[in-house]
Amino acid sequence: MTTAKVNLLDFDRKGLRKFFTEELNEKAFRAEQVMKWIYHFGVDDFEQMNNINKKLREKLLHRCEIVAPIVSEAQHSADGTIKWAMSVGDQDVETVYIPDGDRATLCVSSQVGCALECKFCSTAQQGFNRNLKVSEIVGQIWRAAREIGLEKETGRRPITNVVMMGMGEPLLNMKNLIPSLELMLDDLGFSLSKRRVTVSTSGVVSGLDQMTDNIDVALAISLHAPNDALRSQIMPINDRWDIQDFLASVRRYIASSNANRGKVTVEYVLLDHVNDDMDHARELAELMKDTPCKINLIPFNPYPGSPYKKPSNSRIDRFQKTLMEYNYTVTVRKTRGDDIDAACGQLVGDVIDRTKRTKMLKAASEANLIAGDVIQVKAV
């Protein structure tokens, strides 16, 4: 029976050193040499690692592999944004590259689909299949760098920032998230500053408390409502951890974090006549008064079948100005890649839904039960 090869992209530095010493009977520094080839030079062929002796190269060829997701489709936006469908087995996840001057941000997925049911997000409507492995998370970054070009001649980084804001809820994949983040920060990995790696969560308090004890990166929270009643309606996770539980966990995290400089980024998607009234703005201002933050308003990005609409520019402007009257720093996110469905909330991929959510949504639609209202569909 043929033994499956070990994918070296599944190891952070500590894990790779252990694998080399315990499984390959090699010195730990050899693991670090290989890491540098993989992440600094984008090499996936052991034969190209010319400072590794032939015996070790043969051992690696026999027992190991370096396999990242492959691009099955690429779409290019007029604004320079690129959306890649990346193959992870027989399914696809979506990864988005957003260039902006000297800054180049990669939006990375953490799950195939999403286990949560946020009503305004197209990813949620696809259902959920599984968590991504470490190699499939960091492999998106590795593959994107290859696609863009490592630009060795100029010395410029092809990717300066990573945001865990793609498909899925990162904190429901803690086992693979933490080593993935370690590789992003590691000098022998992608060597990113902890302030340039951002994890966004919808409110998985247990996961955020684990992050507090294990990793320091920038944090963004998907809040999207100023009270529990409304948040539970559009984000069912609020029934498990309510707003006060969530914010208490956020305060614990930023108190222990250097990456956040004492503040969290609050993400608030604006849904026309749902959560964008001036009373909502004032309620949000009051809610956040004990949690140091900056607020990022996200005008809703439509997708087929959604019951929601983007607010008018005047409503967005009034909402922002109301918050600013309370001395908050408030930005409105510039929509990027919406012409290729690469904007916030539009990622769908190709998901084999294990929750049966997509089948239930289709049945409800055919029975005329949606009718433009917020639907309440539970996974089975």
From Swiss-Prot:
Matching entries from InterPro entries are given as: Aldolase_TIM (IPR013785), Elp3/MiaA/NifB-like_rSAM (IPR006638), Methyltransferase_A (IPR040072), RlmN_N (IPR048641), RNA_MTrfase_RlmN (IPR027492), rRNA_lsu_MTrfase_RlmN/Cfr (IPR004383), rSAM (IPR007197)
Biological process (GO) annotations held by this record are:
rRNA base methylation; tRNA methylation
State the active site.
Answer: E94 (proton acceptor), C344 (s-methylcysteine intermediate)
**Pfam families, alphabetized:** Radical_SAM (PF04055), RlmN_N (PF21016)
Residue span(s) of domain Radical SAM core: 100-339
Q: List the disulfide bonds.
A: C107-C344
Q: Which residues form the signal peptide?
A: none
Could you list this entry's UniProt keywords, alphabetically sorted. Answer: 4Fe-4S, Cytoplasm, Disulfide bond, Iron, Iron-sulfur, Metal-binding, Methyltransferase, rRNA processing, S-adenosyl-L-methionine, Transferase, tRNA processing
What EC number(s) has UniProt assigned to this enzyme? 2.1.1.192
Tell me which cofactor or cofactors this protein depends on. Answer: [4Fe-4S] cluster
What highest taxon heads this organism's lineage? Bacteria
The positions annotated for binding [4Fe-4S] cluster are C114, C118, C121
Could you tell me what reaction this enzyme catalyses?
Answer: adenosine(2503) in 23S rRNA + 2 reduced [2Fe-2S]-[ferredoxin] + 2 S-adenosyl-L-methionine = 2-methyladenosine(2503) in 23S rRNA + 5'-deoxyadenosine + L-methionine + 2 oxidized [2Fe-2S]-[ferredoxin] + S-adenosyl-L-homocysteine; adenosine(37) in tRNA + 2 reduced [2Fe-2S]-[ferredoxin] + 2 S-adenosyl-L-methionine = 2-methyladenosine(37) in tRNA + 5'-deoxyadenosine + L-methionine + 2 oxidized [2Fe-2S]-[ferredoxin] + S-adenosyl-L-homocysteine
PROSITE patterns per UniProt: RADICAL_SAM
Q: How is the cofactor bound?
A: Binds 1 [4Fe-4S] cluster. The cluster is coordinated with 3 cysteines and an exchangeable S-adenosyl-L-methionine.
GO cellular component, alphabetical, reads:
cytoplasm
Binding positions for S-adenosyl-L-methionine per the UniProt entry? G168, E169, S200, S222, L223, H224, N301
Localisation per UniProt entry: Cytoplasm
The protein's GO terms of the molecular function aspect are: 4 iron, 4 sulfur cluster binding; metal ion binding; rRNA (adenine(2503)-C2-)-methyltransferase activity; rRNA binding; tRNA (adenine(37)-C2)-methyltransferase activity; tRNA binding
The function of this protein is: Specifically methylates position 2 of adenine 2503 in 23S rRNA and position 2 of adenine 37 in tRNAs. m2A2503 modification seems to play a crucial role in the proofreading step occurring at the peptidyl transferase center and thus would serve to optimize ribosomal fidelity.
What more does the entry say? Answer: Reaction proceeds by a ping-pong mechanism involving intermediate methylation of a conserved cysteine residue.
PANTHER family in the record: 23S RRNA METHYLTRANSFERASE, RADICAL SAM CORE DOMAIN-CONTAINING PROTEIN
* NCBIfam families hit by this protein: PRK11194.1, rRNA_mod_RlmN
Protein family (similarity comment): Belongs to the radical SAM superfamily. RlmN family.
Record-given protein name: Dual-specificity RNA methyltransferase RlmN
Organism lineage: Bacteria, Pseudomonadati, Pseudomonadota, Gammaproteobacteria, Vibrionales
Gene name on record? rlmN
